[in-house]
Amino acid sequence: MATTKQSPLKTLNTLLAPGAPLASEDLAAMGISADLAVHYVRAGWLTRLARGVFCRPNDPPALHPCLLLLQRKLEGLHVGGRSALDWHGLRQYVAQQPMLQLYGWTAGHLPSWFTDRFPAEYHRKRLFDERPETLLHVGPFEQRSRAAQVSAPERGLLELLSEVGVRQSLQEAGELVESTYSLRADVLRELLERCTSVKTVRLCLLLGQKGSLPWISKLDPATLPKGSDRPWVSRSAEGLLVLKP
């Protein structure tokens, strides 16, 4: 019995999820060479987003599929900090055009085809004693298939606090901490124990105590890496920040 081989174009339209961009290697895996991809673009069957990145016509790239593609390019890429808290519903107000906060293990930059559609910032950050292939408390958003990697709210909080005095105001951080009454103390404890930033650990304890949050009473400061007995001091646009051990 004769069999009919499916054309590469039909394979692309059958397998590709809505809103998903494609890299050149994805096309090659479907039997679409670089020359054939050029032909498809000229024929209007593919849209070129940038060199080596394509999407289907009349199928605008969606955020999660785009992040999944970037995760293959930037080791340890995930939604973190203020954005992670926002995704988990922990926010003080809704920004008109929020800036997506992305963190990763290595230095790099976000391509313009992505940032033109989704305003975002990428920062290399190694805040915990961990490996990029097994990031602590980072996983698919809401455990959904084909969802981007995002920090758990406990990790998002510490990533946010690590930015205080750099790209994050202390006042806004304090306001956000006030909304974290539902954080899991055991998860926060594990992250704090493996946190490499003395400032972040001290600031978490200070703001937790100031807000009388439920999780603070379940943490033992004596077991956490708070550094030496000397105060941690930093000057920013907001003034002098002094964190006692």
Residue ranges of predicted features:
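Hydrophobic alpha-helical interaction segments
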Residues: 30, 134-245
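Long, compositionally biased
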Residues: 67-71, 116-119, 205-212
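Short linear loop/turn motifs
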Residues: 42-44, 55, 98-103, 221
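Short coil/turn segments at secondary-structure boundaries
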Residues: 25, 83, 97-100, 170-173, ...
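Residues in well-ordered beta-strands of folded domains
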Residues: 55, 101-103, 121, 235, ...
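Short beta-edge/loop segments at beta->alpha junctions of small alpha/beta modules
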Residues: 1-82, 181-196
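Exposed, interaction-prone assembly regions rather than primary DNA-binding/catalytic cores
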Residues: 81-140, 145
